[in-house]
Amino acid sequence: MSKSTAEIRQAFLDFFHSKGHQVVASSSLVPNNDPTLLFTNAGMNQFKDVFLGLDKRNYSRATTSQRCVRAGGKHNDLENVGYTARHHTFFEMLGNFSFGDYFKHDAIQFAWELLTGENWFALPKDRLWVTVYETDDEAYEIWEKEVGIPRERIIRIGDNKGAAYASDNFWQMGDTGPCGPCTEIFYDHGDHIWGGPPGSPEEDGDRYIEIWNIVFMQFNRQADGTMEPLPKPSVDTGMGLERIAAVLQHVNSNYEIDLFRTLIEAVAKVTGATDLSNKSLRVIADHIRSCAFLIADGVVPSNENRGYVLRRIIRRAVRHGNMLGAKETFFYKLVGPLIDVMGSAGEELKRQQAQVEQVLKTEEEQFARTLERGLALLDEELAKLSGDTLDGETAFRLYDTYGFPVDLTADVCRERNIKVDEAGFEAAMEEQRRRAREASGFGADYNAMIRVDGASEFKGYDHLELNGKVTALFVDGKAVDAISAGQEAVVVLDQTPFYAESGGQVGDKGELKGAGFAFAVSDTQKYGQAIGHIGTLSTGSLKVGDAVQADVDDARRARIRLNHSATHLMHAALRQILGTHVAQKGSLVNDKVLRFDFSHNEAMKPSEIRAVEDLVNAQIRRNLPVETNIMDLEAAKAKGAMALFGEKYDDRVRVLSMGDFSTELCGGTHASRTGDIGLFRIVSESGTAAGVRRIEAVTGEGAIATLHAESDRLSDIAQLLKGDSQNLGEKVRSVLERTRQLEKELQQLKEQAAAQESANLSSKAVDINGVKLLVSELAGVEPKMLRTMVDDLKNQLGSTVIVLATVAEGKVSLIAGVSKDVTDRVKAGELVGMVAQQVGGKGGGRPDMAQAGGTDAAALPAALASVKGWVSAKL
């Protein structure tokens, strides 16, 4: 009997756990460490920072079954889902990972053992083919000489994508960074299915199916294309759960595995469909998986970003339900069957089942109201069509009026061999966005909606004041011709010395003035290629076309420049002190402070903070020149300029250098020489997220002010200790030592008092069938002393049951002690639990000693009074 999909998933994880791998839970479908990624689409996503050296784990081997979505963005399988045997919007990627631990030999041997081992998947060895990168002789020899695969089933794949290292068998994270060859394992379904082995002209057939990709990360690709060997090569593998399930269950399509058969039957039941081969059943069975898990991971249907992708998938499923003849809302009814077939992987979904069902039901109900009318309109338009392309305006009208995502319209059209003018659709969509921005109403962020034709020339690198002309005015996000005194507005100039917020540096403040008017600028922002001066007209009136004198607040700008230059010095210093894994994750540079977020997986030690401070100040004392050059992006990278991971840059970039110490891409304003900074002080270091630290620092006058403040605090402390700041450390140590001595003496006194109290209490014990019972509430006794007292009393009383209680700050503390010879009849944990329940608490412990707490002090006397009857019944 073949394994179920759930059993296959578990077997994979169990196998690698037996090989020393940490079983790591699937991460969210919403990536939390990669803003460039729409959805988690591979098992390695959650380990990306580990492979990049930006994060460390307490394990060097890991295995996962990762939930993935490919629907939107670069990896978009949506239009193929339901029409092919192996495309899905949602799938599970089984993977094993080595972070500088094992490499090619073990990775290949592990894969072979799992696939062919009698106790594991037991696949026929003669059905397995492998590919290796053309020059990867090491992997080839492992497969041939150690595993024993015949040469005719080992295929070398070269650069088959038109460039060096552009190959199906060479994996790259990006243009630079970790990369390396990979070996892929294929399963031969047999000659009754059309297709040829990988690398052959017939490789696109369904006979030979890739089931496992094993990536060997052994190089670090540089900006100039050179490959540097990684000091600790790693392994990243991926095997689609649905694909291996199809192989192990002896079927040729993923949609024929047990998981999908069950879901397809559930879809047929809720839609009333009878033909189980209908492709719409496949579409819906696939889509319920992606939709349910996306909602469980916090995505909700909307018209933007991830929410819009979710909406598109839901509406595509609803439309296919309509094609099947569904008469009422059906999609949400599939969440329960989905949970049932997912096994342990569906536990989180089960916890959120009600919410997921409600979101799906609401979205389906909203779309159902317009679906039939929209389909009728589309049928009408297609009937009138003379060519083979539906115009973009009609596609947009279906979206705007009836809520049809363009890919849903394209789905309907494709079934009739008709294309959609998607460029025309996008043009109509952009026009609608423009109208929406202009007509924006109450409660909106008006300034964010401003769109300006034309550009402003920024001249603030060399000027802090210059003359310009007003090219546009905006009030509440709307273009106006003029403004009057008291009005808040955004003023756009043809040229300006004002720096618009960018790259972490805040926008400039200052004043625009001219004949009879003055405009106070409180912020400066970019609007496309234009620069907007945000503020209030203090006096007079201002209109488009007026000449103005633009004056930047030069003292504020000067402080910002110092902080920005210090940020660059600190970034370079952090990389020297902590390591080159340090990369900027965010920054804020204003006139008061600089804040810098960076990748590092532990809190900085005081010695490291001091070392960074000292190194930055050393560069300040060197008085290095701060120079800028405009050059091609690739030339800048070749020069060693640091670029931010995931940041987008133009082809021509501004490179800022500080002597031989720091080179970065930056468009901000800076000091002329590092000596201008004067002094650099770190005021705090903290964590903001996993693997991300934050430093706040001050420079110049701000740094001097912190020194004065610290000196004042030391003087205050010295006065309190009746000493001076020179010997403050010695004085504090003396006070702490004296405090420790006093605390020790106090503890001894408390213990003596407790012993005396115990002696007094022992006389109050009552005899119940040969067992001494002592129940007492003690005033003024610390809760932690109760245990000592119980131990003393047990020694004094012999066969005994003891319950002591005290109240401190309104909270009840309880302890029960039972001598060993009585625990077969009276359990301390049960006893203290009975009392705690009456005072609004709970607790437990061993049969001979147990503790509890409560919040209802008023109920304590009655609770203690109940002990005698409870114990008597047990004895």
UniProtKB/Swiss-Prot annotation:
Its EC number is 6.1.1.7. It holds the Pfam family tRNA_SAD. The keyword Zinc applies. One of its GO terms (cellular component) is cytosol. It is an enzyme of class 6 (ligase). SMART domains: tRNA_SAD. Binds 1 zinc ion per subunit. It is found in: Cytoplasm. Zn(2+) binds at H564, H568, C666, H670. Catalyzes the attachment of alanine to tRNA(Ala) in a two-step reaction: alanine is first activated by ATP to form Ala-AMP and then transferred to the acceptor end of tRNA(Ala). Also edits incorrectly charged Ser-tRNA(Ala) and Gly-tRNA(Ala) via its editing domain. Consists of three domains; the N-terminal catalytic domain, the editing domain and the C-terminal C-Ala domain. The editing domain removes incorrectly charged amino acids, while the C-Ala domain, along with tRNA(Ala), serves as a bridge to cooperatively bring together the editing and aminoacylation centers thus stimulating deacylation of misacylated tRNAs. This is Alanine--tRNA ligase. The lineage of its organism: Bacteria, Pseudomonadati, Pseudomonadota, Gammaproteobacteria, Enterobacterales.
